[in-house]
Amino acid sequence: MKQTAFYQQRRVLVIGLAKSGFAAAKLLHELGAIITVNDQKPFEENKEAQQLEQLGIRVICGGHPLELLDEPFDLVVKNPGIPYTNPMVKKAMEKGLPVVTEVELAYHISEAPFIGITGSNGKTTTTTLIYEMLREGEKRPLLAGNIGTAACEVAKKAEASNWLVTELSSFQLAGIRDFRPRISVLLNIFDAHLDYHGTKEAYAQAKANIFKNQTNEDYAVINADDELVMQLAENIHAQKVAFSATKVLGRGAYINNGFIYWNDEAVIAVADIVLPGKHNLENILAAVAVAKLAGVDNKSIYQVLTTFTGVKHRLQYVATIDGRKFFNDSKATNILATQKALSAFEKDSVILLAGGLDRGNEFDALLPYLHNVKAVVLFGQTAPKIARVAKQAGIETIEYVDNVEKAVPVAYQLSEPGDVILLSPACASWDQYKTFEQRGDIFIGAVHKLK
């Protein structure tokens, strides 16, 4: 492992546990740091804190006492979900303490190069595609970050011959100092997490941090169809590699005459790809670009794209019941994701299940995508806002329910054979559910109860 000596005897404050904070605390302990862990959840209910205390780590739970920062810490590692406006984090920064996230630790200790994937939508699908292509091409990839295992846990085991394929959120990227991926991917930028970042500009800048430390020895895979992405990449040092679902580029990954091309070579016919949804073509193009940069052969890419059907909770087919098809798109935590989901069913009659956490967004951008939606079933804090837009779109059937579980039988009663019943909330889940996965699993369970 690189840079392990740096942490020996360093006094480190870890703020916030959950998966990434817990992994960071364990790693720092192994590296010989003197750690204090601080978490909001009371100790009696906090399994992670209890486990860390058993390792001999100092644990302070039940709040974030500002006086803790009067102690002489060298570094603060914060859980990515804790915003920079948090009083504890603000005080640490005012004191001039470095404040980083667990991904930074992973970079410091990893022998393997990173492939970092970010964007408002499509991160998980693209990350999974890249991992599968590199695995098929025998490039020894390891999957890390927002998918599955915390990055620093994976980085501990990584060797120089591996690739660390890492999904990165704006929360993680906002706090990087040294992190430098060999290949970065910026898929798209859309208004998201404004409650965390404050403005779209701050959110976009956090995403653009993925390029911050790259040099001309590295690659940046960027979406030529997204104007803001291209602006953010204008002055970067990495070699730019574009992908486009709408333009014939000549270089990079693009579509021409029904084929996906890499530079001037046809890789696969679009008709042979089994992953549904036009929006997934962008994810596929980005993945093809990364795979080719990592040295994967066309045969391996073809094998993945003719067998990969998607990721759970992302436009996931659930069941057909009495001629109605049910799709779980619980990962649609913003408006753009729901636009793309509705575009995938533009020739179908759709009953849309939507709503969730109110982050201050309006939903007028959904209007052009509602022409084939015959009814909406709404839940959560944003239900009235989405209902207003549905009325503008001329949708007469608008139902309010308490939650996703109750939405499913209501949607079924409103439907006819041949209809698509689509959960695509356009909102985060946190007003009612811990995660979008929990929301999606409840939807799946409710669908199966109809059988």
UniProtKB/Swiss-Prot annotation:
It catalyses: UDP-N-acetyl-alpha-D-muramoyl-L-alanine + D-glutamate + ATP = UDP-N-acetyl-alpha-D-muramoyl-L-alanyl-D-glutamate + ADP + phosphate + H(+). It comes from the Bacteria. GO terms for molecular function: ATP binding; UDP-N-acetylmuramoylalanine-D-glutamate ligase activity. One of its GO terms (biological process) is peptidoglycan biosynthetic process. Disulfide bonds: none annotated. ATP binds at G119, S120, N121, G122, K123, T124, T125. InterPro entries: Mur-like_cat_sf (IPR036565), Mur_ligase_C (IPR004101), Mur_ligase_C_dom_sf (IPR036615), Mur_ligase_cen (IPR013221), MurD (IPR005762). It is found in: Cytoplasm. Cell wall formation. Catalyzes the addition of glutamate to the nucleotide precursor UDP-N-acetylmuramoyl-L-alanine (UMA). This is UDP-N-acetylmuramoylalanine--D-glutamate ligase. The lineage of its organism: Bacteria, Bacillati, Bacillota, Bacilli, Bacillales.
